[in-house]
């Protein structure tokens, strides 16, 4: 069902049995396949592809020409940059070992989950089987081959953790005001990773290898 308040461009290809939530915008030449669910107040940019069975939460932005394949779950507030690709097959082949054309039953979907508030940069590739944590960020062009902890900043090919980011998107700094380095061992006893933009403060959680917010934004700062 497409909510009456949703805006769907005339050139978009929306297959049957698709759910589109209130206030969502779907732009030029987007293809959304059968069984996909798109939540409320989302923006799906031109030439994006949403495969069958994909689940997209609320307030998600998927930019132009992004490809989101079967088996992907996108939680609320996620950003997927232009040209990003979210795959679903760790061992892709066009044919079977006997040389026959591979059919649907010859392969298994390996899911991807993008957690609340996470961001995937322009042209990044997320490999099947990966989970990207809450408010984590993959830089432009990254090839993400393993799961990313909450608030981690990863970049490169294959992607490696290079730092940590705030819920507002800014890179966190240490007590000296320098960009917080990636090495988690340096945070085992530290409670003062701060955001220079909004003032939130985070602590490293060794067991989870991720960050936990300890105090909210300062008064009058961007939320």
Predicted regions and their residues:
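Short linker/helix segments within small regulatory modules
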Residues: 178-192
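Short cysteine-rich clusters marking metal-coordination/redox-active sites
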Residues: 166, 195-198
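Cys/His-rich metal-chelating microdomains
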Residues: 169-172, 201
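Short, intrinsically disordered terminal segments enriched in charged and Pro/Gly residues
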Residues: 211-222
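Structural signal for interior beta-strand "rungs" in well-ordered beta-sheet cores
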Residues: 2-97, 102-155, 159-161
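Solvent-exposed, charged amphipathic helical/linker segments at domain boundaries
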Residues: 146, 163-170
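Short, non-ligating residues that shape and space the ligands of small metal-coordination modules
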Residues: 174-175, 203-205
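Cys/His-enriched microdomains
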Residues: 161-164, 193
């Amino acid at each position: 069902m497409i909510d009456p308040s949703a805006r769907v461009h005339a050139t978009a290809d929306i297959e049957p049995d698709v759910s589109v939530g209130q206030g969502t915008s779907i732009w030029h030449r987007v293809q959304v396949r059968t069984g996909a669910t798109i939540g409320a107040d989302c923006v799906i940019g031109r030439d994006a592809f949403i495969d069958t069975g994909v689940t997209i939460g609320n307030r998600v932005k998927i930019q132009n020409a992004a490809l989101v394949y079967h088996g992907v779950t996108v939680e609320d507030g996620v950003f997927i940059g232009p040209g990003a690709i979210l795959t679903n097959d760790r061992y892709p082949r066009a044919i079977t070992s006997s040389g026959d054309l591979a059919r649907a039953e010859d392969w298994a979907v390996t899911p991807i989950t993008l957690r609340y508030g996470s961001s995937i940069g322009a042209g990044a590739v997320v490999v099947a089987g990966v989970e990207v944590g809450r408010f984590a960020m993959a830089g432009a062009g990254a090839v993400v081959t393993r799961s990313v902890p909450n608030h981690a900043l990863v970049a490169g090919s294959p992607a490696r953790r290079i730092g940590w980011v705030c819920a507002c998107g800014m890179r966190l700094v240490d007590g000296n005001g320098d960009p917080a380095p990636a090495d988690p061992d340096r945070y085992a006893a530290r409670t003062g990773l701060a955001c220079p933009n909004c003032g939130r403060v985070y602590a490293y959680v060794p067991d989870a290898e991720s960050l936990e917010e300890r105090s909210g934004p300062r008064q009058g700062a961007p939320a």
